[in-house]
């Protein structure tokens, strides 16, 4: 349920621009996003490893019900926010849900603090890198194209939109696809599979 909610609310963002500007037909854009999400999910294990064994100590005595409660909490919270049209991060929600359920069952000893420091560093870095990257890219675009006619730029930026949409779909797979795999790995490790 968690990954279905996550895909329903987050995955369309990767193709929204190319579909709304009619650079790609919806069917082609959805197919591209599906393939690249899968490729992204299978292209690494860093996120899955962090979620699966880097933030919650499976030897602390947490149960499979703990993982289920953490995931269910995200589904309820995410569905509630979607219903009210509020922005929500299922990544933060999953981590918080798993942590909250583990702390409720075992206490703070269930948390792996080194793993949490990596998570918080990643969050802080992504905010900073996103701001700086967007600022630099926008500055370069304005500087290069400030005298260009908008009508002539549609085709060029259309190709760039396809590239950025493809990259967003792949990135969504590397992050959110692996996040779900990590939660499943955590659950499977609790039942010793």
For each feature predicted by the language model, list its residue ranges.
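Structural signature of hydrophobic alpha-helical transmembrane segments
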Residues: 3, 60-71
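Short, non-helical or kinked segments that cap or interrupt transmembrane helices
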Residues: 8-15, 23, 84-96, 177-184
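Membrane interface segments of multi-pass transport proteins and intramembrane proteases
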Residues: 141-156
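Membrane-interface alpha-helices at helix entry/exit sites of multi-pass transporters
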Residues: 22-34
């Amino acid at each position: 349920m968690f990954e279905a909610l996550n895909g329903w609310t987050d995955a369309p963002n990767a193709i929204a621009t190319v579909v709304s500007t009619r650079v790609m037909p919806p069917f082609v854009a959805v197919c591209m996003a599906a393939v690249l999400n899968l490729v992204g999910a299978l292209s690494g294990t860093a996120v899955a490893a962090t979620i699966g064994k880097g933030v919650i100590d499976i030897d602390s005595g947490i149960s499979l019900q703990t993982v289920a409660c953490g995931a269910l909490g995200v589904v309820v919270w995410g569905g509630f926010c979607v219903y009210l049209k509020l922005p929500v991060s299922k990544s933060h929600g999953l981590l918080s849900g798993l942590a909250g359920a583990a702390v409720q069952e075992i206490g703070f000893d269930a948390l792996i603090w080194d793993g949490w420091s990596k998570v918080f560093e990643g969050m802080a870095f992504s905010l900073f890198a996103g701001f700086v990257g967007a600022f630099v890219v926008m500055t370069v675009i304005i500087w290069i194209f400030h005298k260009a006619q908008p009508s002539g730029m549609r085709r060029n930026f259309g190709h760039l939109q396809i590239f950025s949409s493809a990259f967003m779909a792949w990135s969504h797979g590397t992050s959110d696809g692996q996040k779900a795999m990590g939660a499943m790995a955590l659950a499977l490790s609790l039942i010793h599979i």
